[in-house]
């Protein structure tokens, strides 16, 4: 759950402590528009949060689209209506390789379109009786201004359909980018916030304590370009990490939410590690000591083509990126209690930037092949064509290069998935690795898709129809380029269907049919005899249940 609905709820409750708030996801509204209409009809105010600043693919939910924003107003019967979120400021994109825009008719469909900070503007609207002269571009002056709204809005999490086990709460640590001093990356919106403005540790802990008191158990420190520089005293383009501040942040989080199950991070700037290796290593060690395993440090490498790096003022050249990947591996590759390595890098590549040629795709591919050949691990490789935003330095360049290179991008993506992603997943979660706390999310025929809760969790396909929303321990049995296959443990051989048995390494259709015909088995020896190859049984011996 992002900060928007929680901040907005906190602003409303701060202005009117007796307000009765209802929160529904966009997917709930799509599935049951009549209920949403009846809730709106009984309300004074309806707020739609819409849009994203980074395009992506989603498993069991998706953000509000331009089509949603254009059609939903017909169902909003409240006296006042508000549109806010990234779409209200930057518009809607049609995915990667496009330019965002606000549909011409959209502003006329809502009473207020908030391009500033929603919680600040909505608080002012309520206290001023929805004055039409309210400045909808208003932004908070300091990051700490949000602390009271963040804490007061925490109880709204109870209304999320995935609460509590399947819900992870995004927690903002700061906004702004030190690289804004030199313009920042050409495509990024973060420099628009100026230099970093850190929230206080006390303010963040207060929010997390309120969330924990409301029942939240999963958290992610997100919404910042580089967590390593949290609390840094430097005021330059590449500030040195403050390991003590990072430790205080995570220690305070643990104290505020002592029963938390997940504490993960998001973005880290690879150039920080390259230029400040000692301080970065110390800060990373504090993170690994105090977070929960299965964590991912998303590195904005963006391109391994040095010409693209130079033309777009990107963060790091390939040498520095490779160094950062190596450092994170050295500290975070130990496997944790949930079966995943503690902390691995995730690599982000952006395509369609000025300076991109056919050689760019080759440079990115061979960069990742080198990572693989060095024996290093990355959790994910995120390849996306840029989404051009207004007010960024790339706005005047547009999306023409992304459209021109679309066919190159698709071919390159397929090559990266086959030649890098698949062998990398085999390294990150070898066959027979047991992942703990895998939650079922989506059923497609006789396949159930599931994931652990966390930052960029690994997608696990289970070849059986299972109830959704349950937590399982799963043994990994096969690897694809973007997901893995597995079975719940213990392996109940006497109860499994044909497809489940066939998914076990070494058991094909003939052996699976034999097992079904000759079961139930009362001992491992009986099972071993039926398999006619003892080596098949050896890796799963401790995982079998013959009841």
Q: Language-model features: where?
A:
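Terminal RNA-binding accessory module
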Residues: 403-491
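Small-residue hinge/turn detector
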Residues: 508-509
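Alpha-helical interaction/regulatory segments in DNA maintenance proteins
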Residues: 528-547
């Amino acid at each position: 759950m992002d900060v928007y609905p929680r901040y907005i709820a906190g602003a409303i409750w701060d202005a009117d402590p007796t307000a009765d708030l209802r929160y529904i996801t966009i997917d709930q509204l799509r599935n049951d528009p009549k209920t949403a209409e009846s809730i709106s009809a009984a309300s004074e105010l309806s707020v739609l949060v819409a849009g994203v600043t980074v395009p992506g693919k989603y498993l069991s939910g998706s953000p509000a689209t331009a089509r949603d924003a254009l059609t939903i107003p017909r169902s909003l019967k409240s006296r006042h209506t508000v549109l806010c979120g990234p779409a209200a400021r930057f518009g809607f994109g049609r995915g990667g390789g496009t330019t965002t825009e606000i549909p011409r008719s959209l502003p006329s469909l809502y009473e207020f379109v908030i391009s500033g900070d929603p919680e600040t503007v909505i608080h002012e609207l309520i206290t001023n009786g929805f004055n039409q002269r309210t400045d909808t571009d208003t932004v908070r002056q300091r990051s700490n201004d949000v602390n009271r709204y963040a804490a007061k809005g925490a109880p709204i999490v109870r209304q999320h359909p995935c609460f509590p086990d399947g819900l992870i709460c995004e927690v903002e640590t700061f906004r702004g980018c030190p690289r804004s001093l030199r313009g920042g990356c050409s495509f990024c919106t973060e420099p628009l916030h100026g230099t970093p403005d850190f929230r206080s540790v006390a303010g963040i802990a207060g929010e997390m304590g309120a969330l924990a008191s409301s029942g939240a158990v999963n958290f992610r420190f997100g919404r910042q370009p580089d967590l390593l520089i949290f609390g840094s005293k430097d005021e330059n383009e590449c500030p040195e990490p403050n390991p003590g501040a990072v430790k205080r942040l995570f220690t305070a989080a643990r104290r505020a939410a002592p029963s938390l199950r997940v504490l993960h991070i998001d973005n880290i700037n690879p150039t920080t590690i390259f230029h400040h290796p000692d301080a970065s290593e110390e800060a990373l060690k504090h993170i690994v000591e105090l977070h929960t395993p299965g964590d991912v440090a998303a590195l904005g490498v963006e391109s391994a083509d040095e010409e693209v790096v130079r033309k777009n003022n990107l963060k790091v050249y390939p040498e520095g990126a490779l160094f950062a990947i190596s450092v994170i591996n050295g500290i975070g590759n130990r496997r944790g209690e949930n079966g995943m390595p503690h902390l691995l890098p995730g690599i982000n590549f952006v395509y369609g930037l000025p300076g991109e040629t056919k050689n760019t795709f080759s440079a990115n591919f061979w960069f990742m092949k080198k990572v693989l050949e060095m024996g290093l691990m990355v959790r994910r490789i995120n390849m996306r064509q840029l989404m051009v935003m207004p007010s960024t330095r790339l706005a005047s360049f547009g999306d023409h290069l992304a459209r021109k290179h679309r066919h190159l991008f698709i071919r390159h993506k397929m090559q990266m998935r086959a030649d890098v992603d698949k062998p990398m997943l085999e390294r990150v979660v070898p066959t027979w690795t047991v992942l703990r706390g895998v939650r079922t999310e989506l059923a497609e025929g006789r396949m159930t898709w599931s994931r652990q809760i966390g930052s960029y969790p690994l997608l696990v396909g289970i070849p059986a129809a299972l109830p959704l929303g349950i937590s399982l321990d799963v043994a990994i049995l096969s690897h694809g380029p973007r997901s893995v296959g597995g079975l719940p443990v213990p392996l109940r051989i006497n109860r499994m269907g044909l497809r489940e048995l066939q998914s076990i390494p070494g058991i094909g259709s003939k052996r699976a049919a034999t097992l079904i015909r000759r079961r139930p088995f009362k001992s491992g020896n009986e099972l071993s005899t039926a398999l006619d190859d003892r080596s098949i049984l050896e890796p799963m011996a401790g995982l079998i249940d013959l009841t």
